[in-house]
Curated annotation (Swiss-Prot):
Changing G82A: Does not reduce calcium-binding. This is Calcineurin B homologous protein 2. GO terms for biological process: cellular response to calcium ion; positive regulation of calcineurin-NFAT signaling cascade; positive regulation of cell population proliferation; positive regulation of phosphatase activity; positive regulation of protein import into nucleus; positive regulation of transcription by RNA polymerase II; protein transport. Ca(2+) 1 binds at D124, D126, D128, K130, E135. Interacts with PPP3CA. Interacts with SLC9A1/NHE1; the interaction occurs in a calcium-dependent manner. Ca(2+) 2 binds at D165, D167, D169, E176. Pfam families: EF-hand_5, EF-hand_7.
């Protein structure tokens, strides 16, 4: 029992980060260990180059977009709390996440809505709150590469935007994006199991 509080002291603001992200103490300690391993020069923060060392991101077609999500507003570094906040979007939804939700508190970072918002931002390259045909095409190019012809990609982008675009403005808003994915199990598809 005493070891739990001594481990918490290793992570500055550990209890606050745990409450905000929903990670267990054990998961938070593992993430802190991973953060320190990525921070090879012991700077206390990570750069884009540090995150590019993560193999799963290096082979992910959206890896660069995911890495960018760690650096909001053009910042050049991410500290441990920021690192964990981004990763919290990928934390699987547990039964206790929905059972104990206080309506006065902010929605958990791993809620369906927050997972969808995170995914939406990966597509909304210019951050204007809409996914245009051009943005959809850019993301599709990243995801399929040369396996599909340019004409096929353009057709897929056109069809995807047309199917989701309910107001006819030629782009997909967050509300439209959410509606188009209502039948998808986003909670599980956007989850990475982190050992407890």
């Amino acid at each position: 029992m005493g070891s739990r509080s001594s481990h918490a002291a290793v992570i500055p603001d550990g209890d606050s980060i745990r409450r905000e992200t929903g990670f267990s103490q054990a998961s938070l300690l593992r993430l802190h260990h991973r953060f320190r391993a990525l921070d090879r020069n012991k700077k206390g923060y990570l750069s884009r180059m540090d995150l590019q060392q993560i193999g799963a991101l290096a082979v992910n077609p959206l890896g660069d977009r995911i890495i960018e999500s760690f650096f909001p507003d053009g910042s050049q570094r991410v500290d441990f709390p920021g690192f964990v906040r981004v990763l919290a979007h990928f934390r699987p939804v547990e039964d206790e996440d929905t059972e104990t939700q206080d309506p006065k508190k902010p929605e958990p970072l791993n809620s369906r809505r927050n997972k969808l918002h995170y995914a939406f931002q990966l597509y909304d390259l210019d951050r204007d709150g809409k996914i245009s045909r051009h943005e959809m095409l850019q993301v599709l190019r990243l995801m399929v590469g040369v396996q599909v012809t340019e004409e096929q990609l353009e057709n897929i982008a056109d069809r995807t935007v047309q199917e989701a675009d309910e107001d006819g403005d030629g782009a997909v808003s967050f509300v439209e994006f959410t509606k188009s994915l209502e039948k998808m199990d986003v909670e599980q598809k956007m989850s990475i199991r982190i050992l407890k």
